[in-house]
Amino acid sequence: MKILFASAEVDPFAKVGGLADVASALPRRLFEMGHDVRVITPCHASSLTAFHDGEAPVELMVNSPDGARRVGVATRTGTGGVPVQLVLDDEFFGRPAVYGEGDDLHRYQFFCRAVIETLRRDDWIPDILHINDWHTAPLAFALRNLAWGDRALRGIASVFAIHNLRYRGPDELNDMVCQAVYYSNMVTTVSPTYAREILTPEHGEGLDSLLQMRASAGALVGILNGLDYDLYNPRTDSHISRQFDLSSLEGRAANREALRAEFKLPPSSGPLAAMVTRLTEQKGIDLVLQTLPEILSSGGQLLVLGDGDEALTAELTRLQAEHPDSVRLAARFDDGLARQIYAGCDVFLMPSRFEPCGLGQLMAMRYGAVPIGRRTGGIADTVLDAADHGEHATGFLFDDFNSSAFAAAFERAVVAFHRQDVWQGLQLNGMSRDYSWGASASRYVEVYLAALRSRGIVPLE
């Protein structure tokens, strides 16, 4: 099957969030399964070296409100050998910011036009156009609208992936997201639980009725995001102080001490709790702040890596000054440091208001940390609560979004932390779970085949 994956960011060319990981790892796994996969993405400033280092780009003209513009499309090799097409327009994309620019509406509408022109002029025509979030949402309507009069586009089926319905880009693109849900042959979300949650007014962001219609037709599917187990492997990870695996779990103690040394934290009698996150309302930082007295009274410490909301940053900075032996904030994102945190913390906190999938809990379990999270979205699908799963458990969950519920879950974790056999069982269970891309990629293939069948196309399986 020929699959074109359109994304605003793709690791290692540009990365802001989890979308870049998915746009790298999922195509790679599909490629390894024998499918003919390509990725197309804007050439942001971080990709300029790769763009200019290789064969000359193909030039094409793309319409814009200001008239036709000349762009370059350079094909480079991405993760695992997957071809990645970098679309360069200096004015729109030759700048550091991937998102958050005042002209994001025009930038990504223009990128979508460039994707269509690339499809029209390329000898390689995909069976599937995999569209991701608001940045590429206009492609669904464009494909449906133009296909009748364009043979190159006629046989392409579309799949629209919702990574986070809360983030829908500029207001003018809200209708495009709605149209993408309506016009795409299939719609996916990044976890089974989130697929159910967005059918409700609470999580549907005004699209719950439309999503219910697609779900009743069998056209909405929740597929859990995977984790690249080659990239995130504590046995080989050069970013952590000491490599370890299931048979050498004592290596985590060395990583915990290295983590404390990095942040100048003294030893403590309780668990070292950590978050690697954007500092936003969604992530439940307010619950952590409200529960900090309970965390500290248990002998615990809190370490946060991430940036975002200024008020949350200021409050964490104040708490760090107030509790110099117990609280640390690194107000930035650092992938290497994040891995050291996964490898060295005892508990990983994810008290999210909602969490479409979440990769943090998957990385934490992969590195032997025990997650404490709210039972929502992908957290509910991946963390096995100690009260429900006994000897097979991997962490601790709570339901209600309030500090009392979170504090109760943390207290359960503290009790387990002081029972070495129980705690080690939780760690080993988490490390033994398989949340790699294999099973998820196979589910995507099923969705692609369903999308083709919905177009009346008999796929060559």
Predicted regions and their residues:
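Catalytic cores of nucleotide-sugar-dependent glycosyltransferases that transfer UDP/GDP/TDP-activated
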Residues: 1-461
